[in-house]
Regions:
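Short, acidic/polar
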Residues: 18-30, 89, 174-181, 306-313
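An alpha-helical appendage that flanks or caps ligand/catalytic pockets
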Residues: 124-158, 199-320, 353-381
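N-terminal beta1-alpha1-beta2 module of alpha/beta enzyme domains
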Residues: 1-71, 165-168, 362-371, 375-381
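Active-site mouth loops of central-metabolism enzymes
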Residues: 7-21, 76-84, 164-174, 231, ...
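Acidic (Asp/Glu)-rich catalytic clusters
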Residues: 32, 59-67, 90-100, 181-185, ...
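Flexible, glycine-rich active-site loops centered on histidine and acidic residues
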Residues: 2-19, 79-146, 150, 190, ...
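Conserved, mostly hydrophobic/aromatic
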Residues: 35, 43, 62, 93, ...
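Hydrophobic faces of well-ordered beta-strands that scaffold small-molecule active sites
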Residues: 3-7, 39-41, 71-73, 101-105, ...
Length: 381
């Protein structure tokens, strides 16, 4: 199994953006020396939720500082961008990195970001689908053109040409069942953020596989992104997770405003309206403890030995062959984030990477996993 780290650069009260960014960049610099296989950058705008407005630019920095590690986006939100510009930047990063990039795409769910870019949210899904098709065509054809609903592109060529067929390493973030269907039909792999009970996430992944096969695509194993809290004792790992994942949850709702229910009436985002009840409960002090415990239970929170057991079960359910981790979240002090990362790298990651038991997952049958629930669903990373 491959193991990566994602940089989710959340602001901290009382700390400058520069200092917070420096802390996360330091974790990024540790990824290759500690033996991680990949480093992922997010895209978000206009709030302190994740200060990473240009993931390809950030990864270009690491392309020059690393030799081996794969570089991934989690994700580029296509409806906010000109697809030609995205294709050019992908091709350039592919060249300067020596073809060691993974490109994740998504459609976003934060109204503040859509408003900031003057893009109607109800156009998100068709914009995503059209932009994705353009990017694939631009990178697989020497010369191409396009006449669509949102984009009209004259005959042109992308230069420099990519060196390693990056379209074969395209993934897309899947939260709703509808998104999984879109990704499967496009032939993309799927990047799943663990925000639902594991059997339910497994059922959505199986649905993606079934759709991909039905339209002639070979489904790839999913990339799974999750938060990690590992410590020598379960109590210490749990205490850290409860404190900082609770704060992360607050930052999610501050950015997405799921608790106000506004997405329930936006075409293409009805699924997110189901999150309203869950997020509203987090604003209720009488329910907050229980809700936080449920969110923490979805993540990997344990001792090193228990981590291996939990990840074996997660792999069995999902068929993942690439785990992407977050060690710094919710304003966690840098020293504690680094300790979290180092302990995982020393005692958990080598087994994941080298033990044959983690090389070829044995998947559950579709009937063993439940369909996506209407409640108990969380937000993107």
């Amino acid at each position: 199994m491959k193991v990566g780290i994602a940089l989710n650069i959340l602001t901290k009260p009382g700390h400058s953006d520069v200092s917070v960014f420096a802390e996360h960049m330091a974790l990024g610099d540790l990824a290759e020396p500690l033996g991680f296989d990949s480093l992922f950058a997010l895209e978000h705008h206009f709030t302190g939720y994740a200060m990473s407005p240009a993931p390809l630019q950030l990864l270009s920095y690491y392309a020059g500082r690393t030799k081996r590690i794969a570089l991934g986006t989690a994700v580029i939100v296509l409806p906010w961008h000109d697809p030609i510009r995205v294709a050019e930047e992908i091709a350039l990063l592919d060249v300067i990195s020596g073809g060691r990039c993974l490109f994740g795409f998504g459609r976003g769910a934060a109204s503040v970001e859509y408003a900031g870019f003057s893009i109607p949210m109800e156009e998100a899904r068709p914009r995503f689908a059209e932009a994705a098709q353009i990017i694939v065509k631009a990178l697989t054809h020497e010369v191409f053109d396009w006449d669509g609903v949102f984009f009209h592109i004259p005959r042109m060529s992308i230069r420099p040409r990519p060196i390693s067929h990056p379209e074969r390493r395209f993934y897309a973030s899947s939260v709703s069942p509808e998104s999984a269907e879109i990704m499967a039909k496009l032939g993309f792999g799927v990047l799943v953020i663990m925000q639902n009970e594991w059997p339910m996430a497994a059922a959505d992944i199986q649905r993606y596989r079934d759709i991909a096969l039905s339209v002639g695509h070979t489904p790839r194993p999913p990339i799974i992104l999750t938060n990690i809290s590992v410590a020598e004792s379960r109590a210490e790992a749990q205490e850290r997770a409860m404190q900082y994942l609770s704060r992360k949850w607050d930052s999610i709702d501050d950015h997405y405003h799921f608790s106000d229910g506004h997405l329930a009436t936006v075409p293409g985002y009805e699924f997110y309206g189901k999150m309203t009840k869950t997020y509203t409960k987090m604003r209720d002090d009488s329910f907050r403890q229980k809700a936080t415990e449920f969110y923490v239970k979805l993540q990997i929170v344990c001792t090193p030995d228990e981590c291996l057991q939990q990840l074996a079960e997660l792999q069995r359910l999902t068929g993942m062959n690439h785990l992407v981790t977050e060690f710094a979240y919710g304003g966690m002090p840098h020293e504690e984030s680094e300790l979290n990362m180092r302990l995982f790298a020393e005692q958990v990651m080598p087994v994941l990477q080298r033990d044959p038991a983690f090389a070829s997952p044995v998947l559950v049958t579709p009937g063993e996993a439940a369909s996506t629930a209407a409640e108990g669903v969380f937000a993107p990373a």
